[in-house]
């Protein structure tokens, strides 16, 4: 899957079956995915979020997907609120949540069937989290990359308001650390570059050995993202 990541230049991150399997395992438990899951998918399946984060875990569990060709906030709300569909799961980047909460049908939409809502791909504004929380929907926040297939870090819904702005903790089978410019691990509270490793990490970039070499320190993927432990 091609991604520009933090460099701005698209690179083909190689995605193998092991990565996808461990991504399913890593996400299934915190997202409460089961055979009863009905998930509305609004991201395109050529995107790692649409395919690997949102669709594959549900397919693996034997749940049900509802796909829409183009995102429309009114249509998405009508599906979420339709008792015939009983949508239990919805995941998206922050923008769709904002478009839906600004839609005139938002306040009147019945969201009682929605048990799990997830957001990632970009920092989520506090106003979005609080607006949806006021409707009884607490969001699972997370961090990931195409290179991490994409699940890497997750914040449980019960901590959404207590830890506003946090990406959470490493998911199953992943390990993270924060390092300085010399690659030395930093103490808690100091900002540095996030490194991550695990069986869900890409082996490298397609036909781009230079990018692969520059992106790894041993088996640690250098994400290029700033982070700190609290």
Short names for language-model regions:
Residues 1-22:
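Conserved AMP-binding A3 loop
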Residues 5-6, 62, 121, 144, ...:
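Conserved G/P- and acidic residue-centered "switch" motifs that form tight phosphate/ATP-binding loops
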Residues 11-14, 41-42, 63-70, 140:
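Short beta-strand->loop structural element characteristic of the AMP-binding/adenylate-forming
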Residues 21-38, 46-88, 98-99, 103:
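Conserved AMP-binding/adenylation subdomain of ANL enzymes
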Residues 31, 87-92, 101-162, 175, ...:
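Gly/Ser/Thr-rich phosphate-binding loop
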Residues 35-36, 113-114, 218:
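Phosphate-coordination loops involved in phosphoryl transfer and adenosine-cofactor binding
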Residues 169, 184-189, 193-230:
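Conserved ATP-binding/catalytic segment of the ANL
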């Amino acid at each position: 899957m091609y991604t520009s990541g933090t460099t701005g230049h698209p690179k083909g991150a190689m995605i193998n079956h092991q990565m996808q399997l461990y991504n399913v395992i890593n996400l299934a438990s915190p997202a409460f995915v089961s055979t009863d899951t009905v998930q509305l998918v609004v991201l395109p399946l050529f995107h790692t979020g649409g395919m690997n984060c949102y669709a594959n875990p549900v397919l693996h569990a034997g749940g049900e997907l509802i796909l829409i060709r183009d995102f429309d906030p009114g249509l998405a709300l009508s599906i979420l609120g339709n008792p015939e569909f009983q949508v239990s799961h919805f995941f998206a980047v922050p923008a769709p949540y904002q478009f839906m909460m600004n839609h005139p049908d938002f306040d009147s939409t019945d969201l009682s069937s929605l048990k799990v809502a997830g957001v990632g791909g970009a920092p989520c504004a506090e106003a979005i989290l609080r607006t949806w929380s006021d409707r009884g929907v607490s969001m699972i926040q997370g961090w990931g990359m195409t290179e991490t297939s994409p699940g890497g870090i997750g914040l449980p819904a019960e901590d959404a308001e207590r830890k506003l702005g946090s990406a959470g903790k490493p998911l199953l089978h992943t390990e993270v650390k924060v390092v300085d410019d010399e690659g030395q691990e930093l103490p808690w509270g100091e900002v540095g570059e996030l490194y991550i490793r695990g069986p869900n990490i890409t082996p490298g970039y397609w036909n781009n050995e230079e990018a692969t070499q520059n992106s790894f320190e041993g088996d640690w993927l250098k994400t290029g993202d700033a982070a700190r432990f609290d």
